Amino acid sequence: MPQNHRLQFSVEESICFQKGQEVSELLSISLDPDIRVQEVNDYVSIIGSLELTGEYNIDQNKHTEEIYTDKRFVEQVRKREDGSAELTHCFPVDITIPKNKVSHLQDVFVFIDAFDYQLTDSRILTIQADLAIEGLLDDTQDKEPEIPLYEAPAAFREEELSEPPAHSVVEEPGASSAEEAVLQHEPPAEPPELFISKAGLREELETEKAESEPPESVASEPEAREDVKEEEESEELAVPETEVRAESETEESEPEPDPSEIEIQEIVKAKKETAEPAAAIADVREEADSPAETELREHVGAEESPALEAELHSETVIAKEKEETTVSPNHEYALRQEAQNEEAAQSDQADPALCQEEAEPDEALESVSEAALSIEDSRETASAVYMENDNADLHFHFNQKTSSEEASQEELPEPAYRTFLPEQEEEDSFYSAPKLLEEEEQEEESFEIEVRKTPSAEEPKEETPFQSFQLPESSETERKETDAVPRVAPAAETKEPQTKESDNSLYLTKLFTKEADEFSRMKICIVQQEDTIERLCERYEITSQQLIRMNSLALDDELKAGQILYIPQYKNSHA
């Protein structure tokens, strides 16, 4: 059985005192181990420290200024009143021992076998100690010889000891003869077939090469055959030579690329490379040129549009003035009387609604056609009379007419009926209600319609935006004339869509009624964060259908903060 073994090793450490803690005389010193033994996996760990304690007198006369950077300073020094001090310092210990060298942890313990110190300087203390560990197993003892499972007899062992030299001599010729036999039997086994196949392959490759090459290669065929014979005679060099030549011939048999094809490929690559930068440059030029072109086009369009509008407006005004001046006062009076009679006849009818739908459109169209014919006749008859009038008389007559219209507006509160010219519709479209709303209201309220004129920027003080007015009875025939004038207006006005003509004809049928629509004005509302369609309808006292129709909304649309809505307001505008 193994006995306890003792492991011993030396420890030497130096510590340094700081300035003001120099040692003049060392009174006592001791070194005690503080060790614990624990098992960690397959090892036994000895962890702890060697605690150094002592007392000494402080050297107050000597104050060195040397700085020791490579030394370890004393951890704790406590000074006393009598000029002495106590020092305490710990040297860490960490030792690991294999587990198979420890029988029991309780048997392992550490102690200080020998201890000495040396004070080389008043600030440097050197400690020398021999540390011993007991309780370990001794591996240096002689191991017991292993007993073999089978032991040969003594006579046989003696023969083995005596025969090995003779046996070794006999084996050498046997080994050489075996090697010779292998060498003799190996060549005739496979090489003949290999040589034949290689030679046949070589001949086939050479024939193919001869067919593809010019006639000069035919002269080389006998030489190739002689080479084949020489290769068959030399067995050892035949295989590598045939392999090398076969590889070289296969490389030669591969068609070489024509120089023309290589040049074509290079030209195509160069074109591709040059095409990409050219396309990029063209894109950049287009992007650079496009802003200038768009600005020029916008500038030209902005300059042309006011000129065209001014020309069209001037043509329509001149045509109106000519038509108004060519009509005689007596003829105007007659036309007014006829219009009054027609209105009286229409008012006496039993059912105004049915007459509106059935009879009034036909009568209105007939009256309009009669008015247009009468205007043309009067123009022909009165043209000779009024051709001698000056421009001053024309302007005077026109101004007198407009003044009479303004006077009639102040006297009678009944609503007036006026037609919109294309230029007026374009100018007032921003301030007026949407066209969709006007068309729907005209279809729903088929009995009456009110056309209100919003003030332009030039005359904000003359008319109020929501004032209803009516011209005297004598102005109705003039309205008929102005309604009929667009039918014989210049070519710029006759090019309007067919839908506008149908709206104008429907408007003329409604023109002769004495009732007005209840539509008055509208407001603009900015939607807040918590507003909904129902809340806005309750706030402005309108129905949700009116709000949805006015703003072209859907039934399931949700309002967003900052959205602008048009709020219609209705009031009774009957005279």
From Swiss-Prot:
UniProt record, GO biological process: sporulation resulting in formation of a cellular spore
Residues annotated as domain LysM: 523-567
Comp. bias regions, Acidic residues: 229-238, 249-264, 438-448
Record region (Disordered): 159-502
Composition skew (Basic and acidic residues), residue ranges: 200-212, 266-275, 283-302, 310-325, 449-464, 493-502
Residue spans of biased composition, Polar residues class: 465-474
Top-rank lineage group of the source organism: Bacteria
Pfam families found in the cross-reference section: LysM, SPOCS_spoVID-N
InterPro entries for the chain: LysM_dom (IPR018392), LysM_dom_sf (IPR036779), SPOCS_spoVID_N (IPR048862)
Keywords annotated in UniProt: Sporulation
Gene Ontology MF annotations: ATPase binding; lytic endotransglycosylase activity
PANTHER family named among the record's database cross-references: LYSM DOMAIN-CONTAINING GPI-ANCHORED PROTEIN 2, STAGE VI SPORULATION PROTEIN D
Annotated function: Required for assembly of a normal spore coat. May be a component of the innermost layer of the spore coat that aids in its adherence to the prespore.
Protein known as: Stage VI sporulation protein D
Organism: Bacillus subtilis (strain 168)
